[in-house]
Amino acid sequence: MLKLYDNGIYLVHGETICSCPEEAAQKSGITTTKEEAAKGTMAYGILKAHNQSNDMDQLRLKFDSMTSHDITYVGIIQTARASGMKQFPLPYVLTNCHNSLCAVGGTINEDDHKFALSAAHKYGGIYVPTNMANIHSYNRETMAGGGRMILGSDSHTRYGALGTMAVGEGGGELAKQLVGRTYDFARPQVIAIYLTGKPRAGIGPHDVALSICGAVYKNGYVKNKVMEFVGPGVANLPIEFRNAIDVMTTETTCWSSIWVTDEQTQRYFMVHGRPEAYKKLAPADVAYYDGCVYIDLDTVESTIAMPMHPSNTYTIHELQANAADILHAVQEEANKQIKGAKMDLDSKFHDGAVWVDQGEIAGCAGGTFDNICAAADILRGKSCGNGVFTLSIYPGSMPALAELYKNGRASDLVNAGAIMRECFCGPCFGAGDCPANGEFSVRHTTRNFPNREGSKPGEGQMSSVALMDARSIAATAANGGKLTAATDLDVEYTNPEYHYNASLYEKRVYNGWGKAEPDAELRFGPNIKDWPEMPALTNDLLVKVCSYITDPVTTTDELIPSGETSSYRSNPERLSEFALSRRDPQYMGRSKEMRAIERDREAGKALPEEVMKVYEALTKAGVANDPANTDIGSTIFANMPGDGSAREQAASCQRVMGASANFAKQYATKRYRSNCINWGMTPFLVENPEVFELGDYIFVPSIREAVLENKASFSAYAVKPDGTVTEFPVSTGALTEAERQIIADGCLINYYRNNQ
């Protein structure tokens, strides 16, 4: 059973749910108010400890440590350098788990890694060499701790099960911490995730996590809020089970997460040689939550998230019973969004069963020691077969892999036909094991967004991914690719004890925290480029709509693809050539044209006839304008852009290509909106986007004044090619004083330069 409460709840002694303060007082003997009880959540206490101001409604946070991987750290360090950073003021972990296998671009990936090593020496960072660990496994093992906060430039920065509130954000927010500034954010609501019962044999963390995603994503129940895991069911989940659920909270669009801690949490830290990192965390005797998700773990079934989102969930038995109908419905819904090649799922149902072509167990969600051992228990003595189906396994860290070799589980998997791979995040973001054209992959990874597995629809390629737990993937492998729920097999799960070998990191990881070498030289490869100059916001703004996307949600993978293009993230100009390339291939040319026009304007050259006709139409409609002194840029419209990755490049690539704004009905995540702001793009909100369309111009007079004065709403004007001018209201939503100035200055780097 999974139930969403319509209203807030009071939790008494961490176990009893009450609907009102009177009931809570009766059960607890404590009289309180909603406002006072809200201070009883674990989240409130951690946020208060990290808040640098006395205002708990408008937070100004500093974090205990930060972390980035090799497709984000170059841009962050470059931004911080340009903003005046001299050394890292807090521990900063730089991992190399994304561009560590692909040979795209020759030396450029390894050039980035060597840049990071040199930065760790110069500024005092922590450098984790290639394939030693994925980013989140390493931070769980070495950095998380009770009551701490960690900021990461990866959306799946989540260590709540270890008592750490972790937040994934775009690079600009990390750069702020590196120059001694704060993370400014209105205090989020807190939602109780109340667990009871115990999962059946064969049920794994992805079954629980996907069930939650399916229940809360579309209705926005936890959007930009904190998910606080409580209830008696928590004690029935091993720590790695909790970790693997926790990392998937990102897919609900929540802001962060936190769990109660217990003896199992304490043992985790003892095993990893850090007993001091443990802290007992629990809600106060009476705590108020703004909502509640009630989950009976006894009732969770083997679950699958069909293409193209982790929330598109069915039980495996439900899919099996209605295979032809569900496969066809998913296929047709996907093909409404996809441009180019089409998805084929109809052919995956034959001989009375659903058949898949590939299985992947990988990374921070799937590649935990417990998950891989469970897969080994299922596959021991069996065979994946010599047909189309393949199975690859990517452990989360080298210590986990070493223990899998030592206890024989890796041998069990290899003997069954699985391939043991490096500690690499590739299958999660399109840089590893892209299926063949037309194939259907099942993966214990974090996401199955359109083409995130690496296919290129513009080149006639289309493959598809569903998410499943490692146990059901192993069960499917044991049946040669025939979709199988792990609960349908009779398996004796051995649950072997884990032994952590810290010496593997001690031998290879460079820990320069507190040992900065200011005279050390940064090592630049030929692909590592500085950020280009960004113009400040002029008083008026003219933008051309260069992409108009009507999908319900637009992901960051669509805004800037991952996979092989990630190798160019150290080169802003080159990477920007891929902006929207899989979703709207013509966007790049349209936006580039507007960038060229703006550069000509800045140089004092005449504006092209098309733009002058726009100004003539505005003048005719009585709208004052000043063409010579008005910034000209591009923009996109999307109903709800920014679901998914924290990658700042989803915004920066638009900006480099000449974008000055986004228009949306709402923004999918706080982190994407923050990325737009930090790169100087005004995040407009519009209620009636039908007033403009692709190719129209939008003129926003006095935009600089409106932003700086924090006006709630102001006018914009849509100008069509025939000269029709339509006035419509726009707003920016809430902006902090710093955010308003960042937009006015043109980007975060300009803001810091202007304030040095």
Question: Model-found features: residue ranges?
Answer:
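Fe-S-dependent hydro-lyases/dehydratases of central metabolism
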Residues: M1-Q756
